[in-house]
């Protein structure tokens, strides 16, 4: 669990902002959203496969646009 020590004469809003930033970097909110509901193993595999396909399409489209300008 990330922790933030409030400095002397530091407003609470600044400490809260630092805490939120630390939590975001640690990926805590994304992890809790992911674990909020049970996901069947088949659904998890399906989601990961779809993400891989999407990643590959994005990667290949980037490569194609880079290759066009060979002048």
From Swiss-Prot:
It comes from Xylella fastidiosa (strain Temecula1 / ATCC 700964). It comes from the Bacteria. GO terms for cellular component: ribonucleoprotein complex; ribosome. The keyword rRNA-binding does not apply. This is Small ribosomal subunit protein bS21. HAMAP family: Ribosomal_bS21 (MF_00358). One of its GO terms (biological process) is translation. Residues 45-71 have a biased composition (Basic residues). One of its GO terms (molecular function) is structural constituent of ribosome.
